[in-house]
Amino acid sequence: VAYIFNENELPKLVSTVPGRERIFFVSKELTDVNDMLAGIMRYAKGAASPYHYHKNCEHFYFIMEGQATVETPEGVTEVGPGDMVFIPAEERHRLRSITPLFYFEFQAPNRFQTTILDGTPADLLWEKVDGKVWVQS
C-alpha cells in the first residue's frame, strides 16, 4: 500500500525548547513502518538542536530554505539550500540555524537512542497539538 500525506493534514510537533517544530511523514504511528523516520523541520533564527548522537541510526538533513551550521567533532560547517548532510550512527552533531531554516530530515532505522552531550532532557520533548508529549528516543 502507498501512503500519501499532506503536511497541512498531519500533526505538528513543537519543541518544548522554543524555536523548533517538526511534522513527520513517515513514522510508526502513521504507517506501521518502524524502519525509518522522515519529516520536515523548521527552526527559527538562532534555534539549535542539542549537541548529541544517535546510537544505531543514520541521520540525514536536506536543507531546503535558510542557512545553518552543522557542528561535528571535525568542526563547524555552514550549509544552505541544496545541501545534504549525512551523519553516520554515533557521530556527534548539532544543527544551528543562522536564518529561519526549513529542511527535510530522515533517520534510519527508527529504533535508536539519542544521547545528549550538551543540552537538557527538555531538548528531546516535543508537544503534540492534543497536549500529549512525544519523547524523542
Q: What residues fall within each predicted segment?
A:
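Ligand-binding loop in jelly-roll beta-barrel domains
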Residues: 32, 89-115
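Conserved short histidine dyad/triad with adjacent acidic residue
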Residues: 39-54
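Glycine- and acidic-residue-biased ligand/ion/polar-headgroup-sensing regions
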Residues: 56-58, 62-68
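A cytosolic small-molecule/anion-sensing beta-strand core signal
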Residues: 64-65, 80-81, 99
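Short strand-coil-strand connectors
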Residues: 71-75, 98
